[in-house]
Amino acid sequence: MAASAKEGGPAGNAAETAPAEEAPSANTEEEEASALEEIVVTATRTPKALKDVPVVTRVIGSDELRKADATNIQDLLTEEIPGLEFGFSMTQETSLSMSGFGGSAVLFLVDGERLAGETMDNVDYNRLSLGDVGRVEIVKGASSALYGANAVGGVVNLISREDTAPWHLDLNSRYSAMGDEWRAGAVLGLSSGNVRSATTYQFSTRRRVNLTDAFDTASSVHNIFGGTTHNIKERLTWNVAPGLKLVARGGFYYRESDRLNYSDRYHDYSGGLRALWNIREGSDLELSYSYDQYDKSRFEGDRRTHDHDYSNRQHILHALFNRILGKLTLTAGADYMHDYLTTYQFAGNGRHLQHTFDAFVQGDYTPVEWFNAVASLREDYFSASRNNAVTARAAAMFRLAPLSIRLSYSGGFRAPTLKELYMDFDMAGIQMIYGNPDLKPERSHNFNVALERMGNIRDGVLRGSYSLTLSGYYNYYDSRITTEDAPGQGDVEAGARYCNEDGVKVCGVDFNVRYRADMGLGANISYNFLHVGGGTVDSQFSQPRPHSATWRLDYERRLGTSYRLLYAALSGRYLGKPESRYPTDGAYSIWKLTLQQSLWRGIAVNFTVDNLFNYRPKIYYWNSAMTTGTTWSIGISIPLDDRL
């Protein structure tokens, strides 16, 4: 990830919305201006004010994180982003669909760093706790010219928050009636001189939830497995000298999923070191090393079965250089990744490794205040498949008051994974699945145009600010990696084999309207239309929906200009009937009522009624809403700091 104060994003925190209890002003025009000046890094890998970014970027800031009252990344994204949906895969691991792309085509980052491990082509989303997150940046569409493989359909970057107070301790706890779920966590920040420490711990536990009975032969899912999760992270920042900063991090993650007569256990060990050096005015250099090891195993009681052992280990070296030359900013970078995988899905629990090299350059040019253009070029090489990929991106923004116009083209690719190249797996006696060493990389071409208008209503009871955004996109997705029937031959059983298929065309429209009145009323409504042509991105786990929407109507009451006393919101999402060759749900909507009450010194109590109108699927498919009807939750957050 780029940055001077950059390291994934904290540079932007200075312009970010302040905590709810200390919001700087109730004046919506000032808040809107602050949001426009918020520094983002994901779209261009260099710090840039949101209003100046030529690529459409959705930012969920700290204030929105509190309003959404989401306990995990899945809830947050589905409540905020139409066209994005989480369901289950065959092993009841979480499966993503976003604008027609599956989880393998969307790159998730934490402070700009990749995550090791996958299950059914998706990362372990339970690793992405929100306890220490300051904001989330989402770029829809291909971004491989900056981020390489997997950024075919988009990038989601979780960026940690920073605090310079001498010390602070944030405690939180939450109970949900569905599955008797308990979540608890703490974030401890310490600062002394040139050194800052941030320690985060998150814990959750949930019982099994019965959705339907075992005699329901039509449903694919009958219950939601229970389990326990622990997530510990440490982040240490040292300002060594003026212009030189070191950031060290480490983390441990453990999850146990309790199945019917066994349990699956997941471990992750991660660490890294980053150096940020402002060489001189207008020049900076970033160097980093990261390590991530993700393991899976199966237990029957206390006995490890060793028939589901899995370990993915990634070592990544990264370098990034920025140079400002007047109105032109040049960026150059390179990465190396050592990717090692051993899994029960290889013959004889075998092991394979891959070396990946890349280099990229970018030019960011702003000749006049109302125009900005960015162009990027990148080449990647993958040793296992002996493939290389060249990708490019070009984007421009015009500010013609009161409109901002953004135009972009971006190329994307996804290299075959080690699993797709070398798999030799008997899927529970159902069929064999074979890898294909001759696979080619998936490629995509994304075109996007967006119009944005922001303004203010200056008189009357509706005085406040608003924004309107309309964007259209077209994706041509070529050489998509999927499976085909493979006839048996000799000692090789018949089964399914990974292959490349013909192109898929995905096009759509996103529309968003936001409004915030000085009196405290607010609205946020988003709609997505999606059309898929050519081939298909349809499966029993991920099915494109032509229509989807999210909304939130809220009211906040402040005491003076700096203390939020009460917050109430009615939010929801609508999912249209999927276009699919498989049996599916019909269209449905789920509504949520949220109440947040501040008590004393920032202590806040949250109460939520979810699925307000008691929706339940008649049949539970893999991508159905996994709900038993109306449920409720209650939580408390307690911030402590040196002002006590």
Label each residue range with its predicted role.
Residues 35-68, 95:
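N-terminal periplasmic "start-of-domain" segments of outer-membrane beta-barrel proteins
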Residues 145, 157, 164-170, 174, ...:
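Periplasmic-side early beta-strands and strand-to-turn transitions of outer-membrane beta-barrels
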Residues 189-191, 226, 239, 363, ...:
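Conserved C-terminal beta-signal and adjacent last beta-strands/turns
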Residues 195, 286-298, 399-401, 405-406, ...:
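Membrane-embedded beta-barrel scaffold of Gram-negative outer-membrane proteins
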Residues 238-241, 280, 331, 348-475, ...:
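Structural signature of Gram-negative outer-membrane beta-barrels, strongest in the C-terminal barrel
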